[in-house]
């Protein structure tokens, strides 16, 4: 059987004024990715799958994000806000290509899943001309009601127009819709604007399809999956729902989350086997964690790689570009940025390792700082394998510390150190016998 082609149109033209933000609504992040990114990730992918995004005038940032995520995306601009059907028809050029399945989604519903899109498409494959996504609302007030005759959808009744009996219905319209792509324009072009707002409503497609002798059906999903986001409070609710989903997926994959509700994950976080995450850990985008790794409490990780059997934290921070080799350890109050730590490296306490490459099995003592910035440019620190850096050491980059070299505690190292060398840089210690007693006695006499 030949695979069905698809066109997914994502409506992202809204201003999002209730967000009270200069950032376009669909670009607000959920689990480290924009809302738009989540919707596009759920849309059908691969051969025969096309994506179009409808944006508002001047929404260059939304266009840029869409193209970052899907280089082949088609961008269409809805010049006037005249309703959802009008927005869909902004992509007329793409619709006219006649994909088998036309999907209409919204850029502010980031919890939509690929499985739900697949179920909508399956309904079309089984002969429906229209499949509308519905949900059972806890409080249906304000939602359009889905009116059924047996298994067929006969109408979508807006709340304001619904009778008392219809308002008692809890099956509500989510807005997401699938349509027979070959019949889509014939249906959409029939939608009029004879209503109080003079707008073209996509929900009218149901009545038009039925008037053409075509079947419409409802596909049900959970209310959480289709919850739209219009305010920062709703954004927080969506974040909570997404985090619950990500935590459950991680635990299902074998990750131990000791206090799941306190751990924050990104949508693209990947885990190996037997990973343990302690409470109050934040994992941002671009993080992979290898087999047997342990992330202790109050650690923060972004765009970093943790190898197998690594230990991180507590109170550790990994910034972008950091890679921990197998068995490496980053301890408490250590920050690493753009640093490669080879297998077995230990940085146990109170250190900053930035723009650095640390060779295997090196030991970095407490209070070590790689001084990587001269006020204008960042510079590299290279530490060879098996090196020992004493406590309270400053390594002024650019600098190379040789393999198996020793750096004495309290040193400020400004020149390269060869392999197997010992480098010390500190003032000679001065000890004056009895001076403390003399100082103390003098102070006591002054207080009498």
From Swiss-Prot:
Mg(2+) binds at residues 108, 230. Residues 233-253 are annotated as: Linker. Disulfide bonds: none annotated. Its EC number is 2.7.7.23, 2.3.1.157. UDP-N-acetyl-alpha-D-glucosamine binds at residues 11-14, 25, 78, 83-84, 144, 158, 173, 230, 319, 337, 352, 363. The keyword ATP-binding does not apply. Its cofactor is Mg(2+). InterPro entries: Bifunctional_GlmU, GlmU-like, GlmU_C_LbH, Hexapep, Hexapep_transf_CS, MobA-like_NTP_Trfase, Nucleotide-diphossugar_trans, Trimer_LpxA-like_sf. It is an enzyme of class 2 (transferase). It is found in: Cytoplasm. Binds 1 Mg(2+) ion per subunit. Acetyl-CoA binds at residues 366, 372-373, 409, 426. Pathway: Nucleotide-sugar biosynthesis; UDP-N-acetyl-alpha-D-glucosamine biosynthesis; N-acetyl-alpha-D-glucosamine 1-phosphate from alpha-D-glucosamine 6-phosphate (route II): step 2/2; Nucleotide-sugar biosynthesis; UDP-N-acetyl-alpha-D-glucosamine biosynthesis; UDP-N-acetyl-alpha-D-glucosamine from N-acetyl-alpha-D-glucosamine 1-phosphate: step 1/1; Bacterial outer membrane biogenesis; LPS lipid A biosynthesis. It comes from the Bacteria. HAMAP family: GlmU. In the N-terminal section; belongs to the N-acetylglucosamine-1-phosphate uridyltransferase family. Homotrimer. This is Bifunctional protein GlmU. The gene is glmU.
């Amino acid at each position: 059987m030949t695979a069905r082609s698809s066109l997914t149109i994502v409506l992202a033209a809204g201003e999002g004024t209730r967000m009270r933000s200069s950032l376009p609504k669909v670009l607000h992040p959920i689990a480290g990715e924009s809302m738009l990114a989540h919707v596009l990730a759920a849309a059908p992918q691969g051969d025969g799958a096309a994506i179009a995004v409808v944006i508002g005038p001047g929404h260059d940032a939304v266009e840029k994000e869409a193209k970052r995520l899907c280089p082949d995306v088609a961008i269409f601009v809805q010049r006037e806000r005249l309703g959802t059907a009008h927005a869909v028809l902004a992509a007329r050029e793409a619709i006219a290509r006649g994909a088998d399945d036309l999907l209409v989604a919204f850029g502010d519903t980031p919890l939509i899943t690929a499985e739900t899109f697949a179920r909508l498409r399956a309904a079309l494959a089984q002969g429906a001309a229209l499949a509308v996504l519905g949900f059972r609302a806890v409080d249906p007030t304000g939602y359009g009601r889905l009116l059924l005759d047996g298994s067929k959808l006969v109408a979508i009744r807006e709340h304001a127009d619904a009778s008392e009996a219809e308002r008692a219905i809890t099956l509500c319209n989510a807005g997401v819709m699938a349509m027979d792509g070959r019949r889509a324009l014939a249906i959409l072009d029939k939608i009029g604007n004879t209503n109080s707002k003079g707008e073209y409503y996509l929900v009218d497609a149901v009545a038009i399809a039925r008037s053409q002798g075509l079947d419409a059906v409802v596909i049900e999903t959970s209310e959480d999956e289709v919850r739209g986001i219009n305010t920062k409070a709703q954004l927080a609710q969506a974040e909570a729902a997404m985090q619950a989903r990500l935590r459950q997926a991680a635990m299902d994959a074998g990750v131990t989350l000791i206090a799941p509700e306190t751990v924050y994950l990104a949508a693209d976080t990947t885990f190996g086997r037997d990973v343990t995450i302690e409470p109050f850990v934040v994992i941002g985008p671009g993080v992979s964690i290898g087999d047997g790794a342990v992330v202790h409490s109050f650690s923060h990780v972004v765009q970093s790689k943790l190898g197998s059997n690594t230990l991180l934290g507590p109170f550790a921070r990994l910034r972008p570009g950091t890679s921990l080799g197998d068995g490496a350890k980053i301890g408490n109050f250590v920050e690493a940025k753009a640093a490669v730590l080879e297998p077995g490296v230990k940085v146990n306490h109170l250190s900053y390792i930035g723009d650095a490459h640390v060779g295997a099995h090196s030991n970095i003592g407490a209070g070590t700082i790689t001084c990587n910035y001269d006020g204008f440019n960042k510079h590299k620190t290279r530490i060879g394998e098996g090196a020992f850096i004493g406590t309270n050491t400053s390594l002024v980059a650019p600098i190379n510390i040789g393999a198996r070299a020793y750096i004495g505690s309290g040193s400020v190292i400004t020149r390269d150190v060869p392999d197997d060398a010992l480098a010390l840089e500190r003032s000679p210690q001065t000890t004056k016998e009895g001076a403390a007693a003399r100082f103390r006695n003098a102070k006591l006499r002054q207080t009498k």
